Amino acid sequence: MAEIKVKLVRSRIGASPAQRKLLDSLGLKRREMVKTFKDTPAIRGIIAKVPHMVAVVE
């Protein structure tokens, strides 16, 4: 299975509580933090909910 890297590009300050929970589920706590995940529909769905805050790094 392929892997993707997700980077937090915008601060969590000002984000709604629901968006913060999504970022918590990804483990992204600080700006510029990068995590690697298996490319699953669940992870893609979380990324789709906060596209303005995260970027997929190749």
Curated annotation (Swiss-Prot):
GO cellular component annotations of the record: large ribosomal subunit
UniProt GO BP: translation
Annotated GO MF terms: structural constituent of ribosome
SUPFAM superfamilies on file: Ribosomal protein L30p/L7e
Gene3D superfamilies linked to this entry: Ribosomal protein L30, ferredoxin-like fold domain (3.30.1390.20)
Alphabetized InterPro entries for the sequence: Ribo_uL30_ferredoxin-like_sf, Ribosomal_uL30_bac-type, Ribosomal_uL30_ferredoxin-like
Record key words, sorted: Ribonucleoprotein, Ribosomal protein
KW Ribonucleoprotein (keyword) present: yes
Subunit annotation: Part of the 50S ribosomal subunit.
Entry similarity comment: Belongs to the universal ribosomal protein uL30 family.
Protein name: Large ribosomal subunit protein uL30
Protein's organism: Desulfovibrio desulfuricans (strain ATCC 27774 / DSM 6949 / MB)
